[in-house]
Amino acid sequence: MAYYTVGTIVNTHGIKGEVRVVATTDFPESRFAVGSTLYAFQKDQATPVTLTVASVRQHKNFYLLSFEGKPSINDVEIFKQSTLKVTDNELESNDLRPGEYYYHQIVGLDAVTVDGENLGKIKEILSPGANDVWVVARPGKSDLLLPKIDQVIKRVDLDQGKVIVELMEGLD
């Protein structure tokens, strides 16, 4: 079963079993909805703990979650610094508009220029601000950083396992 990260528990909040979560998903409303199942991966633990969201509210830049069967701070303190994940069963394709993709769909694809030159494989996606940056691992060269803008990313072909790109001046 594949798991995908949706947030990190950074601390507890109050004494009634709430935790502060930094979301790393574009869909926090559905991922953290009451009744949702999340999997907490703790450091040095191979097996995740299954948690069901009992309540959710937003507070500053965090989501405050409580979980069924965990009514006090003592029940949730062990989850500090845990990574919250969902399974591929919880990913809904209707979350995405045409032309949008999950990170795991992009990472591993070949980056190919419009002229057919293979640049390398996309190894990670950075989110520094206005737009994502796709990092391409190039054999024998330093990594290539491709901004996720229409002028650079021309087409994503999941069936062929490649992304067609047009290198703008200064990118290479």
Curated annotation (Swiss-Prot):
Free-text function comment from the UniProt entry: An accessory protein needed during the final step in the assembly of 30S ribosomal subunit, possibly for assembly of the head region. Essential for efficient processing of 16S rRNA. May be needed both before and after RbfA during the maturation of 16S rRNA. It has affinity for free ribosomal 30S subunits but not for 70S ribosomes.
GO biological process: ribosomal small subunit biogenesis; rRNA processing
Domain of life of the organism encoding this protein: Bacteria
Compartments where located: Cytoplasm
Protein name per Swiss-Prot or TrEMBL: Ribosome maturation factor RimM
Keywords: Chaperone, Cytoplasm, Ribosome biogenesis, rRNA processing
Coiled-coil positions: none
InterPro entries attached to this UniProt entry: PRC-brl_dom, PRC_barrel-like_sf, RimM, RimM_N, RimM_N_sf, Transl_B-barrel_sf
Record-annotated PRC barrel domain positions: 98-171
Lineage: Bacteria, Bacillati, Bacillota, Bacilli, Lactobacillales
Family: Belongs to the RimM family.
Entry-linked Gene3D superfamilies: PRC-barrel domain, RimM
Entry's Gene Ontology cellular component terms: cytoplasm; ribosome
Any GO MF annotation of the entry: ribosome binding
UniProt subunit comment: Binds ribosomal protein uS19.
SUPFAM superfamilies: PRC-barrel domain (SSF50346), Translation proteins (SSF50447)
Domain-level remarks: The PRC barrel domain binds ribosomal protein uS19.
Main location (coarse class): cytoplasm
Source organism (scientific name): Levilactobacillus brevis (strain ATCC 367 / BCRC 12310 / CIP 105137 / JCM 1170 / LMG 11437 / NCIMB 947 / NCTC 947)
